[in-house]
Amino acid sequence: MSKDTKIISDLRSFFAKNDDNRAIKCIMGVMEHINIRSSQIGVEKKENCKFTTLQVLNLLMLFPFFVVKNASRYSNSSLSKLFNCDKDMFYRFMNDGNVKWRKLLYAMNLQLIKKISSSTTVHHNKPVCLIIDDTDAPKTGMTTELIGRIWSHVHQKSILGYKCLTMMLSDGVSQLFLDFSLHGEEGKDKQKVQGLTAKQRKARYTEDHEGQAVKERVDEYLMKKTDKAIDMVKYAIKRGVRFDYLLVDSWFTNTKLVRFISSRHIKCHLLGMIKLGKTNYATKQGKMNAKQIIKHLQKEKACKHNKILRCTYCTMDVKLDGVPVRLFFCKRGRKGNWNGLLTTDLSLSFLEAYRIYARRWATEVAYKDCKTLLNFGKCQSVHFAAQIASFTLTMMQYNILCTVKRFEAYETIGGLFAEVTNDTLELSVTDKIWAIILDFVLEAAERYSIDATELLADFIESNPVAHTLRNMYIYKQAS
């Protein structure tokens, strides 16, 4: 991963002796060409530590590939037989608030993006998308720094943990985690801020982070996710990331985001779900909200039927706070609920918009892969800096797996991971099987008036088989 360390090159040489270790050799090959300098990490080597900070980072990134669940399990792993060290070395590194994890993640991603761009011989015309979404990060330790209760849409109740806001880059073939932030929720009960009593809040671990890199992350904790999403996109553009569409769900689609995207100097558009609420849009017939627009289009008999998606849809160009946008409304069946999409791209057709937006479901698969394979959010440290470190490492590991999968003959991240860890994973499915399941979910959503996207996400989250089927479908479509 750098010129001043031999860990990755030594491992690659070690596995090169056996032709059966193709997967791990591919991972070593990707990591070896990622150039991260020690100065980018933000902390210096400890005098009593035989490894440099860059070598410690390398070893941490290798944990899941050598079936090391956490630092406490390192001494019994095969990796420790090659690079012997004490577990406290890893704890000290992860607890250090001076490590610049956001910059490290971007330093890796920009090199992976460059590798993907230069190594892809067959170019496709699929748009590049930024996808912003969030997921629950449940916790059990009440003394963890900044811990609190959050509302889980999956479980429909408050749980102890963090909300993890993520931003992914997808080109329709593979996706990379670009950025993330951890958030808490103040809650409505002033007597129990963040869902905790005064005694519980006092029992949490606290630390002064002034002057540390993690201070930026602490400041993000109670920041509105909609505002942080804009900051993430700003930073991505600043670092040279280019995209065609920003995909968001109805929680993030608002006037501020529409104005922000439409004012960028690069050519990009917003494509997001909208709530059928009280937001007014300027039309030729005057100001109308979403429900009024639907009634107007029905009255004008402007609704059409799409045979491919088997749904009724209608379209109208309007203005939101002076910004021209196109609205799409669709429903399945006569009694189905209407759903709305908004885009700043006035040239986009309904079918194109639907297909592009469907890519957002890939985030659910990515979350599932990270949680089941890479210990996403499983860090047990009370230090908030260690929580940030753990999430970043997981995303780095996932991005490496995605890059290897793209250029090698692996259909899924799970299949690649299984081969790396000498495990077996039977993956056999066809597009038709997934199509049947998708139809079932859509019909159930229509019959019981449930949001299809949320139902599908919950189905994938709670059912390993459904997750595998969806995973296979995405990658087969991409190929």
Describe every region a protein language model picked out.
Residues 67, 83, 88-92, 154-243, ...:
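Electropositive, glycine- and tryptophan-enriched low-complexity nucleic-acid-binding patches
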Residues 266-279:
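Acidic, His- and aromatic-enriched active-site or binding-groove loops in soluble protein domains
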Residues 38-114, 171-176, 230-239, 243-250, ...:
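Short, positively charged, Gly/Tyr-enriched micro-motifs
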Residues 18, 42-45, 95-199, 312:
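Active-site-proximal, Lys/Arg-enriched surface segment
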Residues 126, 130-136, 350-381:
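Short amphipathic alpha-helical "interface-anchor" segments enriched in bulky aromatics
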Residues 140-143, 254-263, 279-286:
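A short acidic (Asp/Glu
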Residues 1-52, 66, 78-82, 184, ...:
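A short, flexible helix-boundary coil/loop motif
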